[in-house]
Amino acid sequence: MKQRKPGCYIVAVLLAGLMLGGCGNPNAKANTAESVSANDSETVSESEEIVSAEAETENGFEKETETESESETEKETKKATDAKETETESESESETETVKGTIDLSKVEAKEAYHFEIVSKGFQHQYWQAVLKGAQEEAERLGVTMNFVGPNSESDIADQVQMLNSAINAKPAAIGLAALSTDACNDALQQAKDAGIPIVGFDSGVPGAPEGSVVANAATDNYAAGELAAEKTYEVLKDRIAAAEGSVRIGVMGQDATSESIINRGLGFIDKIAELAEADGYTVTVEGNDKYVQDSKVEPTDDAKVILDVAVPSQVTAELSATDCQTLLNKEDTICIYGSNQHSGEAMVTGNENLQKLGSGEDQVLGVTFDSGTVIKEAVKNGTLYGAVTQAPVAMGAAVIDLLTMAANGEEVADVDTGCQWYTADNMDDAEIAQNLYD
């Protein structure tokens, strides 16, 4: 397999006080959320604290103390026991990946009544409304105001850049940015840095951004989330691949090849499926969109047993993505389709309406996706889709406000992994998961 450059290390953090509940430029097509101010009567309930095995070792969580009187044999026995417990703990938490660590965001306080500009990827999906809700609630708690904007479509990169420029001209205390493109915003980011305005990324990072311009990111570890989806998918597909006489095709639907979050969810899924299939002795290849073919770890090969077929529409529209789904469903060797966000998941449901090929039966095409919303939740519940990865969008919105406030205070900030969970019809009503499934 091709070697993949290591991604940025995300510092784990503790998120407390977050609870799931729920514009500027006249020349750009945009949706706008009104600025919000303090409301001292509102409180935020305490969230669940979860600690990663890696953070336990590096940051001193649950460290075991050893006395000098312990013999070498006792120490070795203790190490073996601790390692086994850590492995078991890691396995038990594999389906619920949430954040924890060294920065307690629940203790953030604003030194002044700051104003923030936040430029989102858009409002065309309920996901962004959930992020907005979290941001509004936390802004009210901290006594700061914000202006939350985004383009009408996640294809409107130029509109988003214009909104970012308008945000800079407003001279806020800090700016939140969910970048649609990993390079289109770089000039504006440099301008913000020169003006002394810190930028906090959310949902997507901005690889290649001018050094020091983006001070932190609040996002899911998207590559790891794609891997999680692949692991759960391969558990179901393993026997079908083994039983197939010829090649099998796994479709990968991405709404674009420009957003870091979408790309990494796709690559995480592709690379992990390839790793698992190759471990079982199968050959794997990737075809379709050039970006994913070139950036995946998979070496192209002829006559592969497992074909990962990546479909990306020319524009981010429901119609084009539904057509991509139908094209994949109509290929005789397709056994699965994975959609890497709410847009793609809903397009899968739409594309399947006339064909009725998605499902968990042996002669059906397995469907897995990302996020939630009414359409996806119902499709998982009724078996059209097997499962999905949910993020924590309300917690993400709150974390953005916390990081913006810390940056405006002049405090040290760090990346926040807002976590992800795998859900199916069997566990989607569990309290820990249901709180992250928005309508």
Where are these regions (language model features)?
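Bacterial N-terminal signal peptides that target proteins for export
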Residues: M1-I10
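A residue-level marker of the well-folded mature domains of exported/periplasmic proteins
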Residues: K2, G24-D439
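C-terminal motif of bacterial Sec signal peptides marking the signal peptidase cleavage site
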Residues: L18-G22
